[in-house]
């Protein structure tokens, strides 16, 4: 009779696994050390600790416990004519504290490689406030006049060279489109001009529908959002001035549902065309910024918009047609 000692076998397996793990770890460390020496890769760690203390005279329409303020809540009178929303509110928060890692010094395919990883404690949704949230995570390949960036970055309609300077963290929302999403971005430079093409999806900032805010509607359309922009930037260091201007357009299609309420396959989609034009002039003592936005179904960028059912083509099967809300 042969008896298997399972405890002994498990101990031997653990020892073997530990040895293999140590060897792999040592190999990875050696490989990374060699790569750093070869390419002189540098990691720059940064971030900050931020505390916000605020008091509002009335209730607000906002996110993250009042931290991301949109606008004051409307008047809501009770039977006695007293405004329910005329109730003060305050909060103390540290959720904007941020950590960041910038990577430089690598080279591949004759390109300079850089990257950025940034996170805060804002949370993706109101229920998970105070939890770690990914903000930016991308790799950039630079060939001089051509750049390729892939990863999570600012949405195309948020121009980092020209956005509102505000006291509140909302940065101009819901008028100014705001958000970050996964994307593939190609930039071609022509002197002071830049031609930019972007394919983007949705993550934390997503379209809204019957299932709430989710990137599923865009993914089910089978195609990412496409953006094309032209930027111009001129900097005069001697005079201390900077001039930036540009235009852009994007188009996306979402599929609000793949099955009707009566169980039939749904193929209806809704498209949306967006446009932006911007200008900034900065001098030593003043800065002027002008921006114009046109949007169709832009609820995914924290702006006023969305879509609606414009027609019921088959009441029995539940087929409908959609139209975007224009902003």
Give, region by region, the residue ranges found by the protein language model.
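Active-site-proximal beta-alpha loop/turn segments in soluble metabolic enzymes
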Residues: 167-168, 203-217, 255-263
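Detector for outer-membrane/organellar transmembrane beta-barrel domains
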Residues: 228, 240-327
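Surface-exposed loop/turn segments flanking beta-strands in extracellular/periplasmic regions
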Residues: 64-77, 310-317
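Outer membrane beta-barrel
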Residues: 36-65, 75-205, 222-223, 227, ...
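Outer-membrane beta-barrel and related beta-rich outer-membrane complex signature
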Residues: 57-61, 162-164, 207-209, 257-259, ...
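Bacterial Sec-dependent N-terminal signal peptides
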Residues: 1-33
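Low-complexity, intrinsically disordered short segments enriched for Gly/Pro and polybasic residues
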Residues: 1-8, 199, 208-209, 243
